[in-house]
Structure formats: C-alpha cells, structure tokens
Amino acid sequence: MTKTDRVCVGAIAGAFGVKGEVRLKSFCTEPTDIASYGPLSTEKGDRSFRVTLTRPVAGGLGARLSDVTTKEEADALRGVGLYVDRARLPSLGDDEFYHADLIGLEVRDTGGALLGRVHAVHNHGAGDILEIAGAVGREGLLLPFTRAVVPTVDLAAGRIVADPPEGLD
C-alpha cells in the first residue's frame, strides 16, 4: 500500500489519565467518525490500533487504543499520526478534498505566476488554510481555502489556481 492509498485521519496528542487512555486529535469532518474506520495504523504501518472513544476532552477526544494499557505506553505514542486505507473513507462530494490530496500540488495565481506548492493544510477553527511553500524568490504564503481565493483545484493536473487577496500576493 502506498502512502497515497492511506489518509491521516488523526493524531495522538498524548496520554490522558493514568490508565493508558489517550487524547486523540481527529482530522475528520465529524470528529467521532475516526473510531468507525476500523483499525488505524501508524504512518509506517508497523502498528495498528482499534479505537474506542471514551469522552470528549479539551482539545480532542478521550480514547482507548488496543494494546495500550499504561500511561507510559500512551505517552510514548504522542505525536503519532493515525492512518486509514482510503477505500474505507466515505466518498467525497464535488469540491471536497482530503488534505492529503492537496499537499504537494502546484499553486499558480490567476495570471499563471507560480506561487509555490501546498506544504500543509491547517484548520484553527475558522476554516482551512493552505500553507504555500514559496517558489524561488518568494516567501511562504497562507491562503484561506475558500472558493473566492482558490477558484480551481485540479487534482488530475496536480495544480491549484489561486486569487490571493490584495496585499498577499
């Protein structure tokens, strides 16, 4: 299975409590869906976990992971991304994208000038933001991922057309 066959759906933020529970950060549209995709694996695929959600907690979800029974085991997993086979994820509607599909796409402005490539997708609660790693001679750029600012996403061609707001270009 290649990396593109898998999508990162969450990450372990650290231990929660003293009995092996973890604080889980879900990247799913509906955060609790993370537990419904079956076993989740690490990026390398060397470990997999069944997830049982226990309760909402500050900054995420409390969860139990199969084979994690102590606080020390949970602490050791801090920062580990959790991946699922893309085939187990729901189909997306038009103009919906998995963050993993956007990362690496070339970004050009409406005049064709290269702005860079998508380095990361962030969401701090008010909507997705594309982090564009700058082209030669350009600094990085943060763009709101809205239809007005990003009118075209062409996954097949590997490109995005952006219309940065005045002052950001």
Swiss-Prot record:
One of its GO terms (molecular function) is ribosome binding. One of its GO terms (cellular component) is ribosome. Keywords: Chaperone, Cytoplasm, Ribosome biogenesis, rRNA processing. Transmembrane segments: none annotated. InterPro entries: PRC_barrel-like_sf, PRC_RimM, RimM, RimM_N, RimM_N_sf, Transl_B-barrel_sf. Coiled coil: none annotated. The keyword Nucleus does not apply. The keyword Chaperone applies. Its main location: cytoplasm. Residues 94-168 form the PRC barrel domain. Pfam families: PRC_RimM, RimM. GO terms for biological process: ribosomal small subunit biogenesis; rRNA processing. It is found in: Cytoplasm. Gene3D superfamilies: PRC-barrel domain, RimM. The PRC barrel domain binds ribosomal protein uS19. Binds ribosomal protein uS19. An accessory protein needed during the final step in the assembly of 30S ribosomal subunit, possibly for assembly of the head region. Essential for efficient processing of 16S rRNA. May be needed both before and after RbfA during the maturation of 16S rRNA. It has affinity for free ribosomal 30S subunits but not for 70S ribosomes. Belongs to the RimM family. This is Ribosome maturation factor RimM. It comes from Cereibacter sphaeroides (strain ATCC 17029 / ATH 2.4.9) (Rhodobacter sphaeroides).
